[in-house]
């Protein structure tokens, strides 16, 4: 019989930098998970993606064992990296902070495809373009 799930924890952690300090420690401590075990496993699995923020979904079972799934970095993080900016615009409808080329958007959309519920790359590109627009980033052809 399958183990019973008692908690689902969703976090966004910098790749290769999970440690027992907040926010990781308290979130997993409440669920009774071996925090160091998770940190070591997460860091080993994400060391090749240094500098990115990785969303992770941790499933905690009744016997306090756990499994976790890493997702692709958020579109906003990938767009900021592509545009070379620290943060998006406070007023995206008035102030444009940067611009990215359409082929960069396509690259980001292809990276995000496994996590988006888009039928094809064009639909994924439109989602990424919407994120860019709400951050004050213009798209150039």
Curated annotation (Swiss-Prot):
For this protein, the record's Gene3D superfamilies field holds: Ribosomal protein L11, C-terminal domain, Ribosomal protein L11/L12, N-terminal domain
Q: Which Pfam families match?
A: Ribosomal_L11, Ribosomal_L11_N
Keywords attached to this Swiss-Prot or TrEMBL record, sorted alphabetically, are: Methylation, Ribonucleoprotein, Ribosomal protein, RNA-binding, rRNA-binding
GO cellular component term of the entry, any: cytosolic large ribosomal subunit
Q: Which residues form a coiled coil?
A: none
Q: What does this protein do?
A: Forms part of the ribosomal stalk which helps the ribosome interact with GTP-bound translation factors.
Q: What is this protein called?
A: Large ribosomal subunit protein uL11
